[in-house]
Design a protein with these regions (language model features):
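Substrate-binding/catalytic lobe of Class I Rossmann-like enzymes that use SAM or dcSAM, i.e.
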Residues: 194-225
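A short SAM/SAH-binding and catalytic strip from SAM-dependent methyltransferases
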Residues: 154-168, 183
Length: 225
């Protein structure tokens, strides 16, 4: 699927356009990125925070959890929001922090004319995302750094329980594009938090989120699940 998505990608070192040359992505400046045999390409820059990447066991556990339908309502709501934006085949659907491509695959089913890019820092997740949907490309990238996508090529950006850089999301979104953002409430994973004495969701999370995204995006609506 990388052959269909390369038109949206750029070099993480020089921001030059990329071309698919056999089993590599290359820019005119000579930077080259191998395509793994599993079908994904890593476009992580030199300053990427790979130390935060999930292990193979963590990815397998998450895939099993999602496969049991625990997030099915969230997945459907994300797909509904994408469908409401409407298809724009000139741009792609980007999922920042896509993991295995669980949410993006459903969104692409609802937008049959569009292609998707699953961006994640974890190679174990990218291996699964590369085969999650025939119109999904899996690309290694750090949500906290420059996104390896060209300016204004994203029609819909997804960000589901994942980190984000508001400036970068605004840069890659096309005029009239939409950001579909999913954040936890205080009830998120409440049973696990209580049983394992984990950190709770910050009461000021919404305020901090609006502070980071304010001025770049107009609020179009929200839904609680």
């Amino acid at each position: 699927m990388l052959d269909q998505a390369v038109a949206y990608l750029c070099c993480p070192h020089c921001r030059g356009n990329l071309l698919l040359d056999g089993r590599s992505l290359r820019c005119r400046a000579g930077h080259s990125f191998d395509v793994a045999r599993q079908g994904y390409a890593s476009l992580l820059g030199g300053d990427a925070r790979t130390g935060t990447a999930d292990t193979a066991a963590m990815v397998a556990a998450r895939e099993a959890f999602l496969g049991r339908g625990h997030y099915a309502r969230i997945r459907a709501a994300v797909a509904d929001a994408c469908a409401a934006v409407g298809p724009d085949p000139r741009g792609c659907v980007l999922d920042v922090g896509a993991g295995t491509g669980y949410h993006l695959a459903e969104a692409l089913d609802r937008l049959p004319e569009m292609k998707g890019v699953a961006l994640d820092v974890t190679r174990h997740a990218l291996r699964r995302a590369a085969r999650a949907h025939p119109r999904m490309a899996a690309v290694g990238g750090d949500a906290w750094r420059m996104l390896p996508l060209r300016d204004g090529v994203v029609s819909v950006a997804l960000n589901v329980f994942a980190p984000r850089d508001g400036d970068e999301l605004a840069r890659v979104l096309a005029p009239g594009g939409a950001l579909v953002l999913v954040t936890p409430t205080g009830r998120h994973l409440a049973e696990a938090i209580a049983a394992l004495d984990l950190l709770t969701v910050d009461d000021r999370k919404r305020e901090r989120l609006e502070g980071k995204l304010g001025g770049r995006f107009d609020h179009a609506g929200e839904r609680s699940i």
